[in-house]
A protein has these predicted regions:
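Domain-level signal for soluble alpha/beta catalytic cores
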Residues: 1-396
């Protein structure tokens, strides 16, 4: 894994804005013979765009993960269910929607009017099948097995082809965590722990395919922290949350067995929804568990207004030797464009706290499907410009 040895490197979390024609092809469930040539071309273009905007460590924009509308918060996890056997759609679960997941959320009680308005807007947006809402009805009813070999190899080959001749430092690909997968209902395994372990066994095949292709594997695990708001915040149950999170760390490490740590980066965030986030658990309550994940780099939110102050945690929490922190220094949570000098300030704070060689500048979360494409690319440009300013200060 590349490090910031002589300058601050830049990357992002994964999702980038999809071309309009690609979104339409996914939305229309176009046949592979029509979709795949467009997908391959789009990946080639997005790799070049990342390089043009100054991103050092690039990916395929997650274009192989189907987005059926321009604004889509769920493609990063919903992509995997067509790659897993063992699920069936139950209409009674689908009708419950996301609300069935957030039964323990103090925030959703305190801001009930806001969330009711958000739900109404989401229902309107989902007309025509443009949302992932029906996926909430998927239920595990049989042994979970990975069946996505062809899909992940397609994505791998598209990225390899796109990188040919490109002036790129390094490339990564994303895959979802067991903790996120186990949120959907289970009607087969005896308990949630057995269910999670089975998911870890299944998804490890995708992890290994990415690493075997010589890409950096990024595991996306928002659930490791945002589950606190959904399931534990009503009773302020930090102890119960930590017990749950500790098991999830064991599960992801099980999935990572045999994969070198220096080929893995691990991403957490507090969810992509544009809400108050008052119920978010603090990084201080989970950082020790985070650092037990067998990854070399940890990708965290640090640019949004609810979590920016948490850089100070690293004054008292030692980043283990050889590890890398990829803090988000531009945010998906706002359309306001970060000034490059602010980006530089954020980078420098981390660099002076944990060492400049241990910092890579990143984004809070994926930008595709969260903000308008023009805003997304402008944020990546600000990220690159800010990293250059930080480099001048740190290496002067």
């Amino acid at each position: 894994m590349k490090r910031s040895t002589d300058r601050i490197l830049t990357t992002h979390v994964g999702s980038l804005p999809r071309p309009k024609d690609l979104v339409e092809l996914y939305r229309d469930n176009s046949p592979d013979s029509t979709l795949f040539p467009h997908l391959r071309s789009a990946v080639a273009e997005v790799v070049q765009e990342q390089a043009r905007f100054g991103i050092d460590i690039v990916n395929d924009g997650e274009f192989g993960k189907a987005m059926r509308s321009a604004m889509d918060f769920g493609a990063w996890w919903s992509y995997v269910y067509p790659r897993l056997a063992g699920y069936e759609l139950r209409e009674e679960e689908a009708k419950k929607g996301r609300g069935a997941w957030t039964f323990g959320s103090k925030e959703r009680k305190e801001f009930a009017e806001f969330y009711a308005a958000e739900a109404s807007a989401a229902a309107t947006a989902s007309q025509g099948g443009t949302s992932t809402a029906r996926l909430y009805g998927l239920t595990c009813t049989a042994p979970v097995n990975y069946t996505g070999q062809a899909a992940i190899q397609r994505d791998i080959q598209n990225l390899k082809s796109a990188l040919t001749g490109a002036q790129i430092e390094e490339a990564f690909m994303t895959a979802v965590s067991p903790a996120t997968l186990q949120i959907l209902p289970n009607a087969y395994y005896k308990d949630r722990e057995e269910y999670t372990w089975a998911l870890a066994e299944a998804i490890r095949e995708e992890y290994r395919a990415i690493v075997d292709a010589r890409f950096i594997l990024q595991i996306d695990d928002p659930a490791l922290v945002d589950i606190y708001d959904w399931w534990f915040s009503m009773n302020d149950d930090i102890a119960g949350f930590r017990k749950w999170a500790a098991f999830q760390v064991e599960a992801v490490n099980h999935a990572l067995e045999g994969i070198p740590e220096d080929r893995v980066r691990f991403h957490i965030c507090w969810g992509s929804w544009h809400g108050p986030h008052k119920g978010d658990v603090g990084l201080k309550d989970v950082v020790d568990l985070l650092l037990k994940v067998k990854a070399q780099a940890y990708v965290i939110e640090a640019g949004n207004v609810r979590h920016e102050h948490e850089w100070k945690i690293w004054k008292t929490t030692k980043l283990p030797e050889g590890k890398v922190l990829i803090p988000g220094v531009v945010s998906h949570a706002t359309n306001v464009l970060e000034h490059p000098e602010l980006v530089a300030d954020r980078v420098v704070r981390f660099a002076k706290t944990i060492g400049r060689e241990n910092v890579i500048a990143g984004t809070d979360c994926g930008l595709g499907g969260r903000v308008h494409p023009q805003i997304a690319w402008a944020k990546l440009e600000a990220l690159s410009e800010g990293a250059k300013l930080a480099t001048k200060e740190l290496w002067s």
